[in-house]
A protein has these predicted regions:
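Bulky hydrophobic segments
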Residues: 1-118, 122-145
Length: 145
């Protein structure tokens, strides 16, 4: 099965989506931490919302980058499911790296427990899967390929 919609540029392959969306989520997180403090962010579970949005942004960005690589002939994929698995694999990689970074930067903090790490990872993965589902099922004629 060949990739069907490679010739049509999907919305997630635009530079503002690829670059600005992940940076925007990161900046929103930092602004909220600055304004309300890390204790308030964790007690009100706002960090889970931010991790979910981060999962959406990483999923869209990695899909956009992979689409550009395919359209230039750098990467050749014959199946759109392989495309989806690559995007999901990159999402998993980023989620794990982000939690390692949080551990390194904030280790002595009382808020970064094992349960918090797992909930952050789950929220990031759910956000990414939600983005894939929305693009595949809800937005007509828009695929991750």
């Amino acid at each position: 099965m060949h990739m069907k919609s490679l010739s049509k540029k999907p919305f997630y392959s635009s530079i503002p989506i690829i670059v600005s969306f992940p940076l925007g989520v990161f900046l929103i997180n930092e602004i909220l931490v600055f304004l309300f403090g890390i204790r308030s962010i964790h007690e009100n579970r706002i960090d889970n919302i931010i991790h979910g949005l981060g999962g959406v942004s990483v999923c869209l960005s990695s899909g956009g980058v992979l689409w550009h690589l395919m359209s230039r002939g750098i990467v050749k994929l014959q199946d759109e499911n392989v495309f989806r698995f690559l995007v999901f694999g990159f999402l998993c990689f980023v989620v794990i790296c982000w939690e390692i970074l949080e551990y390194i930067l904030y280790h002595p903090s009382e808020f970064f427990t094992y349960a918090d790490t797992i909930s952050d990872m789950v929220c990031g993965l759910i956000g990414g899967l939600f983005a894939m589902l929305v693009i595949r099922k809800i937005i007509p004629n828009e695929k991750f390929s």
